[in-house]
């Protein structure tokens, strides 16, 4: 079966109704090894694989971040065709935000901690779009990576609280050869910034080993100070 591309939710829904259900992989495009790993996991399920590409404006704190987000739709389509997915959904803004969802977004209090402390409204924007995709597609499974762990936790909480039937499938973080987690935004990093990101990963990995080996608090704090210096 050749991959079908949909840009309108109504024609997509007609197609989905012919199936037993879908395994959904939501993305914002700029596909990399991490995304492709999710797609491969999805293809192992008994349902049709549906990938979405939608750069969600609601989850960006700055308009400049939204505009600079890496986009290469032709390359993304080529990669997905190669993996022989069933459906690709590239919705318009109206498709996603042109209706009132039945479920209100449940935002757990932990959304204001960690990453949420510095990215006001980000997680609300993520949950808003995920909630809308779920109402449109009603997927059996949703495949998400552990890379954005706080985001994953909040989506799971929303699904649990709203008693949504879609099941979350957690997939491992895929990394570059230097240890940095695969991310579309890595394209925006300079060589020196990429080196810093790689060093941070290796320091954290080292710190984890030391904690497991019951190293003294003094030695652990020394590593922490070195990590802070890296930025």
Describe the residue ranges of each PLM region:
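Nucleotidyltransferase catalytic core that binds NTPs
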Residues: 2-230
């Amino acid at each position: 079966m050749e991959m079908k591309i949909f840009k309108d939710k109504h024609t997509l829904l007609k197609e989905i109704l012919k199936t037993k259900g879908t395994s959904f992989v939501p993305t914002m495009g700029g596909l990399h090894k991490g995304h492709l790993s999710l797609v491969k996991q999805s293809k192992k399920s008994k349902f049709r694989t549906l990938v979405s590409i939608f750069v969600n404006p609601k989850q960006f704190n700055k308009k400049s971040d939204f505009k600079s987000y890496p986009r290469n739709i032709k390359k993304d389509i080529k990669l997905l065709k190669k993996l022989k997915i069933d459906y690709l959904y590239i919705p318009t803004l109206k498709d996603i935000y042109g209706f009132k969802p039945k479920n209100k977004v449940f935002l757990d209090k932990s959304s204001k901690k960690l990453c949420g402390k510095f990215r006001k409204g980000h997680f609300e924007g993520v949950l808003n779009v995920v909630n809308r995709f779920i109402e449109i597609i009603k997927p059996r499974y949703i495949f998400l990576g552990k890379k954005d762990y706080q985001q994953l936790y909040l989506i799971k909480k929303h699904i649990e609280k709203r008693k949504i039937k879609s099941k979350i499938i957690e997939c491992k973080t895929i990394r570059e050869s230097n240890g940095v987690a695969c991310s579309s935004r890595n394209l925006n990093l300079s060589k020196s910034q990429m080196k810093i990101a790689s060093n941070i990963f290796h320091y954290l990995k080292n710190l984890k080993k030391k904690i497991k080996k019951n190293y003294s608090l003094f030695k652990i704090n020394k590593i922490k100070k070195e990590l802070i210096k890296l930025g």
